[in-house]
UniProtKB/Swiss-Prot annotation:
Bilayer-spanning residue ranges: 17-37
Taxonomic superkingdom: Eukaryota
A GO biological process held by the record: photosynthesis
Keywords: Chloroplast, Membrane, Photosynthesis, Photosystem II, Plastid, Reaction center, Thylakoid, Transmembrane, Transmembrane helix
Family in the record: Belongs to the PsbL family.
Pfam families, sorted: PsbL (PF02419)
Record-level GO cellular component terms: chloroplast thylakoid membrane; photosystem II reaction center
Membrane topology: Single-pass membrane protein
Protein name as annotated: Photosystem II reaction center protein L
Quaternary structure and interacting proteins, as annotated: PSII is composed of 1 copy each of membrane proteins PsbA, PsbB, PsbC, PsbD, PsbE, PsbF, PsbH, PsbI, PsbJ, PsbK, PsbL, PsbM, PsbT, PsbX, PsbY, PsbZ, Psb30/Ycf12, at least 3 peripheral proteins of the oxygen-evolving complex and a large number of cofactors. It forms dimeric complexes.
Function, as annotated: One of the components of the core complex of photosystem II (PSII). PSII is a light-driven water:plastoquinone oxidoreductase that uses light energy to abstract electrons from H(2)O, generating O(2) and a proton gradient subsequently used for ATP formation. It consists of a core antenna complex that captures photons, and an electron transfer chain that converts photonic excitation into a charge separation. This subunit is found at the monomer-monomer interface and is required for correct PSII assembly and/or dimerization.
Length: 38
């Protein structure tokens, strides 16, 4: 299953979206923590 498959584009896109979502949550958490601790 190491061959490139165009059908995997949806899975790659959703996984990238998940990573972006986690990154956004992490950034928001850092901003909120710095805001509350200031």
């Amino acid at each position: 299953m190491t061959t490139p498959n165009p059908n995997k584009q949806g899975a790659e896109l959703s996984r990238t979206g998940l990573y972006w979502g986690l990154l956004l949550i992490f950034v928001l958490a850092v901003l909120f923590s710095s805001y509350f601790f200031n």
